[in-house]
Regions:
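Hot-dog-fold acyl-thioester-processing enzymes
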Residues: 1-52, 110-141
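Preference for bulky hydrophobic residues occupying beta-strand positions
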Residues: 13-15, 59, 89
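HotDog/MaoC-like acyl-thioester-processing domains
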Residues: 66-67, 76-141
Length: 141
């Protein structure tokens, strides 16, 4: 993939998460789901189709995410093959309510945000579903 600047292909989603665990820690499945949501949005931007997750090369959980946290998941395009797309994912905690202030409604924006998880994964978008793929990305594969 020479010549094409992939840095412009990224997707960001943000939301407030909750937990059903007694210690208030958010399920790791919720974090992976956030990667999937950001990744699907990225796939729509690139191909006009959500594609299919093939595998994660790596997934790292680096810091806990708690009930009430605001998180930002980012998916970035790293490489494009004929039908495969390699992506990186990051999840940052951008605001926290746990242990902040005297009230249940207390919270604060984190500066800098906390990197809570990261991953690298491969997705597949069959050729017949690549309806919006930019010509430069098609030529590169």
């Amino acid at each position: 993939m020479q010549g094409e600047d992939l840095s412009r292909y990224d997707s960001v989603v943000e939301l407030r998460v909750d937990s059903h665990y007694t210690d208030g820690v958010v399920s790791l499945g919720t974090i992976v789901e956030m990667f999937g949501i950001a990744g699907t949005k990225l796939a729509y931007m690139i191909d006009g189709d959500g594609g299919l997750m093939r595998a994660f090369e790596s997934v790292e959980f680096l810091a806990p995410v708690y009930h009430g946290d605001f998180v930002r998941a980012t998916a970035r395009l790293l490489a494009v093959g004929r039908t495969s797309r390699k992506r990186s994912y990051e999840l940052h905690v951008t605001a926290r309510t746990r242990g902040v202030g005297p009230l249940l409604t207390s919270g604060e924006v984190l500066d800098p945000p906390i990197l809570a998880a990261r991953a690298v994964g491969i997705t597949v978008t069959p050729l017949d579903r690549q309806r919006l793929t930019p010509p430069a990305l098609r030529r590169a594969s």
